[in-house]
């Protein structure tokens, strides 16, 4: 069964995005950013093994939520990028999944 947060998706307006981004980042200076119509954050790790472990858990979350980010992976970094293609913008689903990804490292 799909998560109810993903039902009736719509693109959020600019004010809603800014409000949600502020809530998501909290006190973090280098948290999620709005880049070219998507939520984006780069995570850093001590080595490739740790990076790939993170990628695998993000993949599990994405599959469970049926909401898949773009990932850019290098030796000690992974950039996660969420937007909702079917609404051509950022939706509540993006913020929901971004918060789940953040919780991995909390």
What are these regions (language model features)?
Residues 1-106:
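Charge-rich alpha-helical segments
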């Amino acid at each position: 069964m799909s998560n109810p947060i993903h039902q009736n998706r719509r693109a959020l307006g600019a004010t809603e995005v800014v409000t949600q981004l502020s809530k998501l980042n909290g006190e973090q200076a280098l948290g999620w950013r709005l880049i070219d119509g998507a939520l984006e954050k780069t995570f850093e790790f001590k080595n490739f093994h740790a990076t790939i472990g993170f990628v695998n858990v993000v993949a599990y979350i994405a599959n469970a939520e049926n909401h898949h980010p773009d990932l850019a992976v290098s030796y000690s970094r992974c950039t996660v990028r969420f937007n909702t293609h079917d609404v051509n913008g950022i939706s509540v689903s993006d913020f929901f999944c971004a918060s789940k990804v953040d919780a991995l490292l909390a």
